[in-house]
Swiss-Prot record:
Keyword annotations from UniProtKB, A to Z: Protein biosynthesis, Transferase
EC number per UniProt: 2.1.2.9
A Gene Ontology cellular-component term: cytosol
Biological source species: Burkholderia cenocepacia (strain ATCC BAA-245 / DSM 16553 / LMG 16656 / NCTC 13227 / J2315 / CF5610) (Burkholderia cepacia (strain J2315))
Keyword Protein biosynthesis: yes
Catalytic activity: L-methionyl-tRNA(fMet) + (6R)-10-formyltetrahydrofolate = N-formyl-L-methionyl-tRNA(fMet) + (6S)-5,6,7,8-tetrahydrofolate + H(+)
Name of the protein in question: Methionyl-tRNA formyltransferase
Amino acid sequence: MTHTLRVIFAGTPEFAAAALAAIHEAGFPVPLVLTQPDRPAGRGMKLQASAVKRYAVEHGMTVAQPPSLRRAGKYPAEAADAIELLRTTQHDVMVVAAYGLLLPQEVLDIPRAGCINIHASLLPRWRGAAPIHRAIEAGDAETGVTLMQMDVGLDTGAMIEEARIAIAPDDTTATLHDRLAADGARLIVDALVRLERDGTLPATPQPADGVTYAEKIGKHEAALDWRKPADVLARQVRAFDPFPGGVATLDGAAIKLWAAEPVAARGTMANAAPGTIVEAAPEGVVVACGSGALRVTQLQKPGGKRLPAREFLAGSPLAAGQRFALPDVD
């Protein structure tokens, strides 16, 4: 089916690319795609295009990559050029998903139907940059995707629609991301169909209660503090997969932990100091925590690959009594 509603799309990572693909495949014209500039990535630190740019180029879409959309920012000339491009590109609505750049009021006012954001949380919980990570880390039972009419605040716009999903006990940010991306893609296509048909999308202001913020994930958060309860550390490991990983330091080597589950402390395990390896078996490496213990079932040594505990121990033996370092506490 071919639609007449013209959509400018702004987004950067895979989460956004799923939405762009759905919009394109549904038959909506996309006269312009905005995405962040290419960034150095990988071991060779070569410039790499975003997932959104790769999809857009592959499908013959016009792409712009301004470093900023704020005239008062570090790149006023580039911002002015991008804003002029938005003004001269005929369109009806802008869809924004994990774009990574702030949209000033001047930009929000350009599309006739405004700017619709796809946000990976149940707003107003987890406004901000890392809603998927923080939902898992906090032990939330459910999360979802919210469509909102954007304003200049940080994810404060009126809500158009949401979809809820349960967070499974073994969900990682990677697995939850993929399900949320699919839901976001479905929601935005449905919303655009209604917007084209009705000319408007009713929206409800966000409640004042229940606001939390999902701060951007920093590499400094990767270090596991074994003084914490085992269930908290297990959530951290799941939340930080695929980035930045949970890091445990042993004899100066940073070992990444990719899969772990809390287990009850039994016998002498209950008296072991936090960070102490109490068992190193093919089924997993069990480490004493502030309360309970953590069975680690997937590990990665520096420069190596993710391996099940059995394979990791075959090449890098660990033994009961060894102790992972405790990070400094601010």
